[in-house]
């Protein structure tokens, strides 16, 4: 068609319609598209909520109640945004673990993987600041605990905390700057996502076999468009069930109590999607050690493309690694469970064991298991 030859439409046509896609992609490869759609949902609902939200410690909690009670369909906007964050992270976690399983970090996709990890870190920062905005008990005390972690940095830690707070405690300046950053970061994420897509289309999509065969590609539209559309319908079905029937299931009841600096909640826990990393933080009794471990658990994801020694992409053809991979999934789920439990026996011990395996997988298994597998293959070939 003539409009396809125009510069703008040509770009859209090349990246959304005629984009060559491996013919054997399964439904797990559609979670990247679902993540993009959830990002759009979050931005749109966030803009509408920002129209009625007041970033002031005396008014923030009441402004959220005003949205829920007085604004037309405000309850729908708020529940969509709150539950949308959870579903956004669900989709992204599946996307990450799919990438780990099918070796989407192996050459030539190193930059693609690293850009995805950066997007994930930006998401976590955005979600944390958004959790502070309702100014409930968990909002206030979560902000206090997490920002205090920077005080573990030698010499300049206390100054960094005061700078983050805008004073000597979590107060009105903190809430204002968190609101500003929470509103700004999604657009930074959009920019990072565009870079992610450019890198993806530069090297092409991976596939379950991990073998690049350009002769086995078909256009994205209409084949994978309809496949992703089906995945979106299933996702939205579950999403709407939570919005309309269980809107508060994924939240914390203490956040319906207005922030009180004079009363500490019995258990201070973040949102569920932070729990695995929160468990890593708590598993080390030393403060600076816990902070290093928590941030290290994210930074280690950036090292995977450069420490990997396997010549085979897909875990389907790596039986030993497959066992290690599923043990990682179990360890990650255990960390998420332990993160919401009290700091006592046996939760502390389970958290420590799971944390050790988490780092063991990325620091030992990925760099050395590939070499061992290559040795076994060549030994049996030469036998």
UniProtKB/Swiss-Prot annotation:
InterPro entries from the UniProt entry: Cyt_b/b6_C, Cyt_b/b6_C_sf, Cyt_b/b6_N, Cytb/b6-like_sf, Cytochrome_b, Cytochrome_b_C_euk/bac, Cytochrome_b_N_euk/bac, Di-haem_cyt_TM
Membrane topology reported for the UniProt record: Multi-pass membrane protein
Keywords from the UniProt entry: Electron transport, Heme, Iron, Membrane, Metal-binding, Mitochondrion, Mitochondrion inner membrane, Respiratory chain, Transmembrane, Transmembrane helix, Transport, Ubiquinone
The keyword Nucleotide-binding appears for this protein: no
One biological process term in Gene Ontology: mitochondrial electron transport, ubiquinol to cytochrome c
Subcellular location: Mitochondrion inner membrane
Positions of heme b b566 binding: 95, 196
Example GO molecular function: metal ion binding
Residue positions binding a ubiquinone: 201
Cofactor field: heme b
Binding site for heme b b562: 81, 182
Protein origin, superkingdom: Eukaryota
GO CC terms in record: mitochondrial inner membrane; respiratory chain complex III
PROSITE patterns: CYTB_CTER, CYTB_NTER
Keyword rRNA-binding among UniProt keywords: no
Main location, first listed in the record: mitochondrion
Transmembrane annotation, as ranges: 31-51, 75-97, 112-132, 178-198, 224-244, 288-308, 320-340, 347-367
Free-text comment on the cofactor: Binds 2 heme b groups non-covalently.
The protein's role, per its UniProt record: Component of the ubiquinol-cytochrome c reductase complex (complex III or cytochrome b-c1 complex) that is part of the mitochondrial respiratory chain. The b-c1 complex mediates electron transfer from ubiquinol to cytochrome c. Contributes to the generation of a proton gradient across the mitochondrial membrane that is then used for ATP synthesis.
Subunit structure, interactors included: Fungal cytochrome b-c1 complex contains 10 subunits; 3 respiratory subunits, 2 core proteins and 5 low-molecular weight proteins. Cytochrome b-c1 complex is a homodimer.
Note: Heme 1 (or BL or b562) is low-potential and absorbs at about 562 nm, and heme 2 (or BH or b566) is high-potential and absorbs at about 566 nm.
Family the entry assigns: Belongs to the cytochrome b family.
Protein name per its UniProtKB record: Cytochrome b
């Amino acid at each position: 068609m003539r409009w396809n030859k125009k510069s703008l439409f040509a770009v859209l046509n090349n990246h959304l319609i005629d984009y060559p896609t491996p013919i054997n992609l399964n439904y797990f490869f559609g979670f990247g598209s679902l993540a993009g759609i959830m990002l759009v949902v979050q931005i749109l609902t966030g803009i509408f909520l920002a129209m009625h939200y007041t970033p002031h410690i005396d008014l923030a909690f009441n402004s959220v109640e005003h949205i829920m009670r007085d604004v037309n369909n405000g309850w729908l906007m708020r529940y969509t945004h709150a539950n949308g964050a959870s579903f956004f992270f669900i989709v992204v976690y599946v996307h990450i673990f799919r990438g780990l399983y099918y070796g989407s970090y192996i050459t030539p996709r190193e930059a693609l993987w690293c850009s995805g990890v950066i997007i994930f870190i930006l998401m976590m920062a955005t979600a944390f600041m958004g959790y502070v905005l309702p100014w409930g008990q968990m909002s206030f005390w979560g902000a206090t605990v997490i920002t205090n972690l920077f005080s573990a940095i030698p010499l300049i830690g206390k100054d960094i905390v005061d700078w983050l707070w805008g004073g000597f405690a979590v107060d009105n300046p903190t809430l204002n700057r968190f609101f500003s950053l929470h509103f700004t970061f999604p657009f930074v994420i959009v920019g990072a996502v565009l870079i992610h897509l450019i890198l993806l289309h530069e090297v092409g999509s991976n596939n379950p076999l991990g073998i690049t065969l350009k002769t086995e590609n078909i256009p994205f539209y209409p084949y994978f468009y309809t496949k992703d559309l089906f995945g979106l319908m299933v996702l939205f079905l579950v999403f709407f069930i939570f919005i309309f029937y269980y809107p508060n299931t994924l939240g914390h009841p203490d956040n319906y109590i207005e922030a009180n600096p004079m009363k500490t909640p019995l258990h201070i826990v973040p949102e569920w999607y932070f729990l695995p990393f929160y468990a890593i933080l708590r598993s080390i009794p030393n403060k600076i050690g816990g902070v290093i471990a928590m941030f290290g658990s994210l930074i280690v994801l950036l090292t995977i493309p450069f420490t990997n020694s396997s010549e085979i992409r897909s875990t389907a053809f790596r039986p030993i690694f497959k066992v290690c991979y599923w043990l990682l999934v179990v360890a990650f789920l255990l960390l998420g469970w332990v993160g919401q439990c009290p700091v006592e026996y046996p939760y502390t011990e389970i958290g420590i064991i799971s944390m050790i395996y988490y780092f063991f997988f990325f620091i030992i298994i990925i760099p050395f298991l590939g070499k061992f597998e290559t040795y076994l293959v060549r030994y049996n070939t030469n036998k």
